[in-house]
Amino acid sequence: HPGETLSGSSLTYSLGGKGANQAAAAAHSGTTVAFVGAVGSDPSGQRLRSDLASHGVDVTHLREVEGPSGTALITVAASGENTIILDAGANATVTVEPAKASLFPSPADIVVLQAEIPAEANAAALAWAHSFGARVLLNLAPARPTYADFMARVDILVVNETEAGLTLGMPAPASPTEAIGIARALRGLGPKHVMVTLGADGAAWASGSEAGHCPALTLGEAVD
């Protein structure tokens, strides 16, 4: 609540972010992965570049710019739910012309975008990807109203329940059944396929005229 001070149990600094995590995971699966973007001239930027490279990710087109790298402050409750506050840092410098100049010198099968860089740069990436038939996955986080017209050109849209509600201007789904309806509504905006992630409740999806729900796996304590 505003004005309230709470005690935490631990503090951890780590490298990550959706794009970096996805790139590293894809590289470990044996896929050829290139990361396009920008990091700052701070120690975090140097670590991000070297860490991604150590996971087998091509960082040739990961530019270094003056200023801080993008940073996220993530608070995690005992239940596992989190809140995230972003400072775009170097991510805000990814603009259309640098994107056109560095966007993958050779064709890719799939291009993954997220809303932590300017919408204009994402639009340039999407047009480039579709020019040779690649599929485009948009992870719309953070949710931004400026992407309303962008949706119709996206092949795969991935959002969580909060982002889904914000994108549609309605409350987040309170159950998997509601999430299926939300996925259908998002599908109506134009993406060919939609996934709404629901944390421990799995994910809802919509594809063509079909929609459904996939439960989450039941696991023991997560170790990493």
What is the predicted role of each segment?
Residues A24, T71-T75, T83-I84, G202-A206:
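Short beta-strand scaffold segments in enzyme catalytic cores
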Residues D51-E66:
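A glycine-rich helix N-cap at a beta->alpha junction
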Residues H1-A38, P43-S54, P215, L219-A222:
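Glycine-rich phosphate/adenosyl-contacting loop at the front of the ribokinase-like
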Residues A123, H130-H213:
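Conserved phosphate/ATP/ADP-binding segment of small-molecule kinases
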Residues G56, A90-E97, V136-A143, A216-L217:
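Short gly/ser/thr-rich secondary-structure transition/capping motifs
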Residues A26, V111, I156-N160:
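Residue-level signal for inorganic ion chemistry
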Residues A38, H61-E64, I74-A115:
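Conserved phosphate-binding/catalytic loop of the ribokinase/pfkB sugar-kinase fold
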